[in-house]
């Protein structure tokens, strides 16, 4: 009998196609989590510790798994469970594919526009200290701005639908909170009897959006301060004084806030695949993918990133493992926070009745694009690979037999996982693993 691991018959989980398996966020955690915790003075919130533990244990024996065995040659593969944490670089792909498959029927046969609303640098420390308040306000100000400007007759005069996705990172892992939006290029007339299309390749004026967004966000921030919903500690402690607070806010009313509105990258091809491709970049994303990690050596992490200020030129950055983890974990979302939200006729309350009406009115208006055709006949998305537990697979060793599950070891409960030592206390040590079940002879 051959006892083989899954790494011997294919690239390990997280390896990019055509690229040798490299370092992962989980590996960095397993070797340097203790250093990171020490750099925080041992004071890490329980929720962050849970995320650290789950990401470090992802697809290792610590989370349990199963063994598949070939019924012809006896070759074995060992599969470990995924952590399913939404901050995990290994687990986002399958979630993204399933989400896109569920939402594909919502696409309308019209050009879509992308929007980006970004908070100015001066607000980042305050937002980082108050993520729930700051992110909720960012969503609210963005959605209200888009809908109110679109409803103005001189701009569009229509009720629109909006999907917003929160991002908190830049390409080099710096804290950069902003919201990406995807908006159909038009909307329903106020009386709901016709579709009002946006002008060719022009949706809404960015300058008007920027000014309204700025006013709404700052008004909401003032309300949060007045109601005592902001944590003002450390460097922010002086802002608890009313006069200091007003003086600090004042320049932000004169600053230009960055807002972008443009068609998708493939402007001349507004078909479903183009929209899906755009959506896929922003759904279930994490601060950095494992494919961008180049190396981990002597306590330092190297990764590549694109500098769009220099036409997307690829650069490399090396950080200490502790600094890398600090940057990574500043992008943790508050527990239970919803980072993808829908508004207008795309909201959960309206979409059931509004979307069929939109399709009907688009057809009557004669704006159905030939590339899109029937809006319901959208090609199926590639599905995430099914778990080997769900079906037998052809043996990659002999090419004749079927791999079938012959043994399982269960996933630990959260309390059990939190008591495990999944990271090392010495950076040169490998993370310990749970002992898999004893091998069972083939039946």
Q: Where do the protein language model's features map onto the residues?
A:
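Beta->alpha loop/short-helix hinge microenvironment recognizer with preference
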Residues: 1-443
